[in-house]
A protein has these predicted regions:
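Amphipathic alpha-helix face/heptad-repeat signature
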Residues: 9-12, 36
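Well-ordered alpha-helical scaffold segments within catalytic/enzyme domains
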Residues: 11-30, 79-89, 130-142, 195-206
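Extended, well-ordered alpha-helical scaffold segments
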Residues: 16, 20, 27-47, 89-101, ...
């Protein structure tokens, strides 16, 4: 809905504004660099002001018509760690919620709602696992990041050993192939393969250190 200010989208726009500012700085265009730096700073302030729910201790989407957050905790909230927007205190609260409520047998569930839709429980998606893992690392939560990584890789391995293929999404509650939504589970899958390769390489590098 157009009433919703998405926290994950705004974190990505913040990162884009920072990148553009840095590019203009390299091109020796300080006025344009400052313009985008200022835009990024304003966006960060707005995310911290409007998307943090002090009651749930989590970052959420903001409903600007109602004047408050949606009250729904989803993995979109971890984009604030990935973009290094959250304070250290907020990151600690987010990490606690991730560990206590989102972490399942096969990785992180996307939301805490189970309604048969593919973007909700019990499904987990590769890009969001990656964002969460890297975001947690930005704030020093390497143990939790490793646990998520290892559970996700194990779920991928388990499904591959049974079906001889990678798939679009996974049921992380039961560590099996995902389901739900308006179309059949897709084989492949680009982001599943890419995230698996990146996390597997990271694990192997850490093992050698």
């Amino acid at each position: 809905t157009t009433d919703i200010v998405a926290v994950d989208l705004n974190c990505l726009l913040y990162q884009l504004e920072i990148t553009i500012a840095e590019a203009f700085q390299l091109l020796k265009q300080p006025l344009l660099a400052r313009r985008y730096q200022t835009a990024a700073e304003r966006r960060k302030e707005a995310i911290l002001r409007y998307c943090w729910n002090a009651e749930s201790q989590f970052f959420e989407d903001y409903n600007f018509r109602k004047g408050h957050t949606t009250g729904r905790r989803t993995l979109a909230g971890v984009f604030t760690l990935y973009a290094k927007i959250a304070t250290s205190e907020q990151a600690a609260m987010v990490a606690h919620t991730i560990k206590q409520e989102f972490l399942k047998k096969g990785g992180l569930v996307t939301t805490l709602e189970q309604n048969g839709q593919q973007w909700d429980s019990p499904n987990g998606w590769a890009p969001l696992q990656y964002i969460a893992i890297m975001g947690l690392r930005e704030y020093g939560y390497h143990g939790l990041a490793n646990e998520i990584r290892d559970r996700w890789l194990a779920a991928n391995d388990r499904v591959f050993s049974e079906k001889r293929k990678m798939v679009e999404k996974y049921d992380v509650v039961h560590a099996e192939a995902g389901g739900g939504g308006e179309y059949p589970l897709q084989d492949g899958f680009g982001w599943t393969n890419g995230v698996y390769a990146a996390l597997y390489d990271e694990k192997e590098r850490n093992r050698g250190e």
